[in-house]
């Protein structure tokens, strides 16, 4: 009896996640550049902001040599579909403007992200999913509204209207 109830709960959660039609932003840890991948959901978007201030790993953007970050640094770079503005070394917030924010389009940008934990899982130069958790993505829509989503331990921030 209990097992069938658990299956129903798990299935319901999977259906809910699959039905999410909002915007999503995924963080991909990589070397030498970390990457953010955007999927525009049910509403047109004009820009996306990333706010690392609430992240479990006390994350920062490492954009210059000799600054706040560790070893490797990489400035913000368009990887397809965004206009990349400068980001100060050690900053915790960035904003990119979308070249084409129509429903269903994708965009990506890269930058180095480091954590500031003394006992981090993979060292301060690499970010794990648990360290990104709590960071915020703000999706700016074409009609001027903002939709906010919190990154989870899977490195995803999704708006499910």
Task: Set out the residue ranges of the language-model regions.
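Short acidic/polar inter-strand loop motif in beta-rich domains
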Residues: 115-118
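N-terminal signal peptide c-region/cleavage motif recognized by signal peptidases
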Residues: 12-17
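Sec-dependent signal peptide recognition
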Residues: 1-8
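Short beta-strand elements of extracellular/lumenal beta-sandwich folds
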Residues: 23-43, 53-55
């Amino acid at each position: 009896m209990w097992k069938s109830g658990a299956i129903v709960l798990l299935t319901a959660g999977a259906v809910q996640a699959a039905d999410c039609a909002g915007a999503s932003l995924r963080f991909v840890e990589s070397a030498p550049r970390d990457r953010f991948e955007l999927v525009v959901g049910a509403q047109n978007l004009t820009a996306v902001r990333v706010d690392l201030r609430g992240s479990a790993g006390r994350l920062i953007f490492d954009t210059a040599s000799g600054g706040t970050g560790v070893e490797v640094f990489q400035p913000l770079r368009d990887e397809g579909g965004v206009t990349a503005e400068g980001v100060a070394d050690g900053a915790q917030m960035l904003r990119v403007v979308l070249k084409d924010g129509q429903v269903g389009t994708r965009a990506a940008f890269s930058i180095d992200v480091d954590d500031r934990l003394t006992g981090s899982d993979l060292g301060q130069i690499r970010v794990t999913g648990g360290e990104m958790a709590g960071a915020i993505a703000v999706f700016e829509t074409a009609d001027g509204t903002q939709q906010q989503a919190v990154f989870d331990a899977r490195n995803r921030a999704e708006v499910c209207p």
